[in-house]
Amino acid sequence: MSSGAASGTGRGRPRGGGPGPRDPPPGETHKLVVVGGGGVGKSALTIQFIQSYFVSDYDPTIEDSYTKICTVDGIPARLDILDTAGQEEFGAMREQYMRAGNGFLLVFAINDRQSFNEVGKLFTQILRVKDRDDFPIVLVGNKADLENQRQVLRSEASSFSASHHMTYFEASAKLRLNVDEAFEQLVRAVRKYQEQELPPSPPSAPRKKDGGCPCVLL
């Protein structure tokens, strides 16, 4: 579970009340990036997670940043979340924010087949920019409240995520379904990845016995 304070810098978007990120608790800082095609609900998911508010109007994002201080699995963390553009005309900006991200929420809409096709390209681009075979990424099928308009089967998305070593959530920003869970799972994936990336600790030097230098008898 997570809890904590939040703030945002999105233009024309509601700002959360309460304390800001000026004095984060001791712990971790993770840069999370929300990516996906245009109109899939990236901003709605982000604002629902940050401010518990559903944005119903589609307002194309260029780039908005938010901060949330929360606790995941008992460990405090500051999450710097970047909500990115999905439109093709802003595609040149993608590599810049991909370089900075510690983890990615890869979003499509279950009622938009094209948006699902696009996540494969974004996944490949993330790994290329990071020069890694694996990276912390969580796949989210948003707009689960539009089941009667579904174009992407749950089994298809689950199979894709499993083959690419991602956790998959079907979420609804409108119903606040699996919103917190997706972000929390991404934090866990980032932690696990960073632990694996840490260099091994150097072997500790053997302790010398009291009584001076060791001697060799001839």
Curated annotation (Swiss-Prot):
Residues 7-20 have a biased composition (Gly residues). Its main location: membrane. GO terms for cellular component: cytosol; plasma membrane. One of its GO terms (biological process) is positive regulation of endothelial cell-matrix adhesion via fibronectin. Residues 1-30 are annotated as: Disordered. It holds the Pfam family Ras. A motif (Effector region) lies at residues 58-66. It catalyses: GTP + H2O = GDP + phosphate + H(+). SMART domains: RAB, RAN, RAS, RHO. PROSITE patterns: RAS. It comes from the Eukaryota. InterPro entries: P-loop_NTPase, Small_GTP-bd, Small_GTPase, Small_GTPase_Ras-type. Its EC number is 3.6.5.2. A lipid is attached at C215 (S-geranylgeranyl cysteine). Interacts with PLCE1. Interacts (active GTP-bound form preferentially) with RGS14. Interacts with OSBPL3. Interacts with ZDHHC19. GTP-binding protein with GTPase activity, likely involved in the regulation of MAPK signaling pathway and thereby controlling multiple cellular processes. Regulates the organization of the actin cytoskeleton. With OSPBL3, modulates integrin beta-1 (ITGB1) activity. Belongs to the small GTPase superfamily. Ras family. This is Ras-related protein R-Ras.
